[in-house]
UniProtKB/Swiss-Prot annotation:
NCBIfam families reported in the protein's UniProt record: atpA (TIGR00962), PRK13343.1 (NF009884)
Chief site of localization: membrane
Subunit structure: F-type ATPases have 2 components, CF(1) - the catalytic core - and CF(0) - the membrane proton channel. CF(1) has five subunits: alpha(3), beta(3), gamma(1), delta(1), epsilon(1). CF(0) has three main subunits: a(1), b(2) and c(9-12). The alpha and beta chains form an alternating ring which encloses part of the gamma chain. CF(1) is attached to CF(0) by a central stalk formed by the gamma and epsilon chains, while a peripheral stalk is formed by the delta and b chains.
Class of this enzyme: translocase
Protein name: ATP synthase subunit alpha
Amino acid sequence: MATTLNPSEISELIKTRIEQVKLSAESRNEGTVTSVSDGIVRIFGLADAMQGEMIELPNKTYALALNLERDSVGAVVLGDYEHLREGDIAKTTGRILEVPVGKSLLGRVVNALGEPIDGKGALGPTQTAPVERVAPGVIWRKSVNQPVQTGYKSVDAMIPIGRGQRELIIGDRQTGKTAMAIDTVISQKDTGIKCVYVAIGQKASTIANIVRKLEENDALDHTIVVAATASESAALQYISAYAGCTMGEYFMDRGEDALIIYDDLSKQAVAYRQISLLLKRPPGREAYPGDVFYLHSRLLERAARVSEEYVEKFTQGEVKGKTGSLTALPIIETQAGDVSAFVPTNVISITDGQIFLETDLFNAGIRPAVNAGISVSRVGGSAQTKIIKKLSGGIRISLAQYRELAAFAQFASDLDETTRKQLERGQRVTELMKQKQYTSMSVANQALSIYAVNEGYLDDVPVDKVLTFEESLHAHFSNTQSALIDKINTSGDWDNNIEAAFKKHIEEFKTTGSW
């Protein structure tokens, strides 16, 4: 006998089934790729894309939305784009580009997206932070009053750099710009300053050599290397500087000191020009886009010395009473010494001073090839170590007078005694400012050398023996006056007792003639 269902049971059953149906609506913004060329994708139908948003493409590929037009979005692909095709689906993610940050990046080599490329396995525990961030406001900043020792006599004496400063290193190719930056990184190994070295558009072999040199000098442990090699896309070369800055800001925000080197911003500007032209943005001077100044200003303004209140607010009270700093050393390559080109003038106007390296000086054997006349540090003077500040005034004057007189001396047949003495002193100062690569010099040894030349102790030393004399003098002091050297290195102070000790022991050393 067939089972009969009454109408009420049927309606109850239907009601139960309807209640059990799970309908989950998902809102997704999708578009279609209409063209792919030279790393640029054009996407039709993405109505709600944001400027700088990550766009998801097939095979876990991402693009960065840069052009928001009326009916399409122009985006630059981060990585390989050979597998992308017209008609592919593109989705908005609602996120802007972020990179990993944290102490586990120290000692590692990563690409522009923060992925390790050194073969040492995955990164340790990290957080992520956006690559683009608004620079700290005026209220949160503090004046620069602590030094960053580069280990170079010529820089620390005449063009001092402070923590939180932006100091440009500018010069033609092969004048020692990268060498100066790497030596500065090596000099920070006992100072607690964390370093970030961003290599933009360099050969992979060059970056490998730099990493090896940092390892040999025990400097890789406090350094993050961000590499966007010449073989990588223009998008990654453009982003790498901002990614490196974000990694450096992690330390600044937590009341620590960090140093970042951008090597070099000329190549970043070229990469950005390439992207802009491919996106059909109108070209300006030297075919650069109109916002190339903003490209560098928004990057370099993120370098700052921030107040205790900023650090306390950022860490939500975990870190108190500590200031943080991010010091930037951007590098710019000039063509035939032309500092009046578009990008060099932009960066000179943004930074707090520049170290100008000259080809003629480099070829003459004066290395580092610093042109003391047009190199300047606008804020570093207030951060200079007391002893170096006291002694270095004479160095600049001696060099300036020497350069001026040397030009006249070529035409003069006979020189008076005063002029001849100034020329001879200038020759010895110039010789003393020479320094080999990877030979960082402590504050005490710099002070000793500067004091010796200022007080005329090198006047009777032949010019070709000046560096030998200096080396022997440092060895003599480290053997006989190690307590004095340690005291100066620790405090950086200058007083009558130190002056008397310098005078007495330099005179003693000269009588031995051991140089």
